[in-house]
Curated annotation (Swiss-Prot):
This is Septin and tuftelin-interacting protein 1 homolog. GO terms for cellular component: spliceosomal complex; U2-type post-mRNA release spliceosomal complex. It comes from Caenorhabditis elegans. The lineage of its organism: Eukaryota, Metazoa, Ecdysozoa, Nematoda, Chromadorea. Residues 1-17 have a biased composition (Acidic residues). Residues 153-199 form the G-patch domain. Identified in the spliceosome C complex. Can assemble into large rod-like polymers. It is found in: Nucleus. Keywords: mRNA processing, mRNA splicing, Nucleus, Spliceosome. GO terms for biological process: spliceosomal complex disassembly. Pfam families: G-patch, GCFC, TIP_N. Belongs to the TFP11/STIP family.
Length: 830
């Protein structure tokens, strides 16, 4: 019982109880009236007759009370035919519809297709091999699609569609957007998937609501046929059932040898046209046929004969069906096709081998011709060299002509067999004889033209060839012939000249010699001359140099070598700085010679090295000069110490000069100014002129420093306070000695008693303790007879009031200042 809202109730009714009590009994189903009206349905005796099961309706129960009825004798019973009944004579074998009442006298017979006997009629009466292999359905194929024809239910469906607005010949839908022609089923041969046998054919048929005759007439008017032609059927291998033609010509298409070979070629194409090699050994299970088949890979699966996919009509199988014979025939066909494909593959392989052998023959013939030509060239080279060797004493010109011919006439053999090595036994003795008496420092151009000619003939450095031909090479053979001639023929003379050379007096001669021969020498020979001959000789002369006694300054004969030696000369710089530091210990800042001595090294040493050297050796001397400078203009009107100090701004950073001016000059300057201002009868105009003259002497680069500017401002404040009558000096002013006009005399103040100076060893010991460094002698280690000490992690020794430290970077002993020593010790510990 359904509710009003359309939902079904799950309550238990009488039918459920009856089914539960008697599960094995016959179940009663509701008829249409019972399902509609339920318990209000009218009772009827035919209820049991209308109810049915899945097997069909029950037979009506015979009613005992009903009168007995008889069957007429003219009605067909079983397989008997009543001759008086015209309907039983209608041989409607084609499955056509029953004629109407007005056509009862006509008998329609369809001879277009054979009738099939019922399965029970075949039996054993059919000859063996001719019976059907399967029971066919009893449905008539001509009744298929009868709904599309204009009879029966089709008229009712069409009338209903026209009542809803459908127009014949147009698409379905409100706007007619539906398809006009229905989808037609087209039989595909074989059992493969869509697209397995090429492009799918398109079937044509009648439109919705159109009969077959109308569709045929329409397609005839459009120039097409409603069915595929015989040729199309033959090409597609299909046989359309239910064809409207009475007869159809069946043509047999035979497979040719070309078709079989084409299949073999497609299966044996290169890997670029086949599937990947990873699929070659995959197991393939074919379940498209009646029996399951297993293939070793996709290649073997593609080699199946096409006959396996050909379909056989069920109608043909009813005529002839012997599976064993069909299997044997198919097996013979497969073996034959396999033999054809194998023979074709062998033929193709033989053709490929023939082509490869022909190509190899051509290459061998070509190689043979080339080798014969090379053999002839080698024979000619041998004859040329053998003829030259017969000459006992060849000249230099004859040797040059020989090698020119070898390079021009036999270039391939010259490079392949390194024929330039022939020059070693022939040309080298001539070169040694030519340069045996040569003095390079006296005649630097001697033999340059000759060596330049041999370089053009023998040198192959452009090609990058450096070794001779062959596998059994000695150490001497690894050198090119031209380099070996230079090494053994010319370099001995240059070595003798370098051993006798004095770098301080013959600097220009050696530089000109090296510059003249560098373009003619290889890079490694030039490197050998500079590092093994020139630099050691310069280092030896630097060790002998004494800046206090030598008349020729070292920079005059050493600095010009920078262009040729470059960084190689840096090895002699530490001894030079060490000796200059010793020479500057007794230097007087008023001596201008130090400026000229150090000026050439400003661009030779690095900026940091040069600044450190000035800070250690020059700046302390300048500070002492400013500290002892006389400020009284009557006694020192020009102040040469100040001028000498300001000249070093060219070589050092202004910070260093500003520090010594602030430390040594301004305290004395301010003290002198205060004494003068506090003296009785002071002339402020003279004081202002004296102050202005000193301010003008200070360079602007120093005035910009805050410490210098602050000291000048302090002096101006003192002058201003003195003008107001205040005492600006902390000490009582002493009387000023009379000064002769016009230059005013500055007051002479009493110098403080000199403080007792500490020794250098005591200063180093005090500095080490103040900064937390260890300071003690090293066991059994001396430098030039002096004890070496540990200063933190550094090694130092004292010599003539000078501290020498082992440079941790250059590993040489060099002089060092106290501040630099502290910084180096801190860096070594950090």
């Amino acid at each position: 019982m359904e509710d009003d809202d359309g939902r079904e109730s799950f309550e238990i009714n009488d039918m459920d109880l009856e089914y539960a009590m008697n599960p094995g009994g016959r179940r009663r189903f509701q008829n249409k009236d019972q399902a509609t009206y339920g318990v209000f349905a009218p009772d009827s005796d035919d209820d049991d007759d209308e109810q049915g099961t899945s097997r069909g309706p029950y037979k009506k129960r015979s009613k005992i009370s009903a009168p007995m009825s008889f069957v007429s004798g003219g009605i067909q019973q079983g397989n008997k035919i009543d001759k008086d009944d015209p309907a039983s004579l209608n041989l409607n074998l084609g499955g056509e519809k029953k004629p109407k009442e007005d056509d009862e006298g006509s008998i329609q017979i369809d001879f277009d297709k054979r009738t099939k006997k019922a399965p029970k009629q075949n039996g054993a009466q059919v000859f063996a091999g001719m019976r059907s292999s399967a029971n066919h359905g009893a449905a008539d194929i001509n009744q298929f699609g009868s709904w599309m024809r204009g009879d029966g239910n089709s008229n009712k469906i069409m009338k209903m569609m026209q009542a809803m607005g459908y127009k014949p010949g147009e698409g379905l839908g409100a706007q007619g957007q539906g398809i006009v022609e229905p989808v037609q089923a087209q039989l595909r041969k074989g059992r493969g998937a869509v697209g397995a046998y090429g492009k799918e054919s398109t079937a044509t048929g009648p439109k919705f609501g159109e009969s077959a005759a109308d569709a045929q007439k329409r397609m005839a008017q459009e120039g097409t046929s409603s069915r595929p032609t015989n040729d199309d059927q033959e090409k597609s291998g299909l046989k359309i059932k239910g064809s409207w033609k009475k007869s159809q010509t069946v043509k047999t298409k035979y497979r040719t040898i070309e078709d079989v070979m084409e299949e073999g070629m497609s299966a044996s194409r290169p890997a670029s046209h086949q599937q990947s090699q990873q699929y070659s050994n995959i197991k393939v299970i074919d379940m498209t046929g009646k029996q399951q088949k297993i293939y070793s890979g996709y290649d073997s699966f593609s080699m199946k004969t096409r006959s396996e996919y050909d379909t056989v009509d069920d109608e043909e199988r009813t005529v002839f069906d012997v599976p064993e014979l069909i299997h044997n025939l198919n097996l013979l066909v497969d073996l034959t096709e396999e033999g054809i494909r194998r023979s074709n593959q062998q033929l193709i392989s033989l053709k490929d081998q023939t082509t490869a052998l022909e190509y190899d023959l051509q290459q061998v013939q070509k190689s043979l011709g080339t080798e014969e030509q090379e053999a002839q060239h080698i024979k000619d080279v041998y004859e040329l060299i053998d003829g030259f060797s017969s000459n006992r004493s060849p000249s230099m010109e004859e040797c040059q002509e020989l090698f020119r011919r070898l390079r021009s006439e036999f270039p391939h053999e010259y490079e392949l067999y390194s024929l330039e090595t022939v020059a070693i036994p022939t040309v080298l003795p001539l070169i040694q004889k030519y340069f045996v008496a040569w003095k390079p420092l006296e005649d630097k151009n001697y033999g340059c033209e000759l060596i330049s000619t041999w370089r053009d003939i023998l040198d192959d450095s452009k090609n990058g060839r450096k070794m001779t031909f062959g596998h059994n090479k000695t150490k001497g053979d690894e050198i090119r012939a031209y380099d070996r001639i230079i090494w053994e023929g010319i370099l001995p003379s240059i070595r003798r000249a370098c051993l006798q050379w004095d770098p301080s007096t013959q600097m220009h001669e050696m530089i000109e010699l090296v510059e003249q021969w560098i373009p003619l020498l290889s890079a490694w020979i030039t490197e050998n001359i500079l590092e093994q001959l020139v630099v050691p000789k310069i280092a030896e002369r630097v060790n002998q140099w004494d800046p206090m006694t030598d008349e020729i300054p070292i920079h005059e004969w050493l600095v010009p070598w920078l262009v040729l030696l470059g960084d190689r000369i840096q090895t002699v710089m530490p001894p030079i700085r060490q000796k200059l530091s010793k020479a500057l210990k007794l230097w007087d800042p008023m001596d201008r010679s130090a400026l000229e001595t150090l000026r050439p090294w400003q661009n030779v040493w690095s900026a940091a090295t040069f600044s450190a050297f000035i800070a250690q050796n020059i700046v302390p001397k300048l500070g002492v000069a400013l500290d002892t400078m006389e400020l009284n203009p009557t006694m020192n009107p020009e102040y040469p110490e100040w001028t000498a100090c300001m000249e070093w701004l060219e070589f050092t950073h202004p910070d260093a000069i500003a520090n010594i001016v602030t430390k040594y000059f301004f305290p004395r300057f301010y003290n002198c100014l205060c004494l003068w201002l506090d003296s009785p009868g002071v002339d402020y105009n003279e004081v202002k002129r004296w102050y202005g003259s000193w301010k003008a002497r200070i360079p602007q680069v120093l005035v910009n420093y805050p410490t210098v500017n602050e000291n000048l401002r302090r002096s101006m404040i003192a002058i201003g306070r003195s003008l107001q009558g205040e005492k600006v000096g902390g000490l009582q002013a002493t009387p000023i000695a009379p000064m002769a006009p016009p230059p005013p005399m500055a007051p002479h103040f009493t110098q403080a008693a000199p403080v007792q100076k500490l020794s250098l060893k005591e200063i180093i010991e005090y500095t080490a303790g103040k900064n937390g460094f260890t300071y003690h002698p090293q066991k059994d280690r001396y430098k030039d007879g002096r004890q070496v000490f540990w200063f933190g992690a550094l090694s130092i020794y004292l010599d003539s009031e000078m501290v020498y430290v082992m440079d941790p970077i250059e590993f040489v002993w060099r002089p060092s200042g106290l501040n630099e020593l502290i910084q180096m010790a801190q860096g070594a510990q950090g």
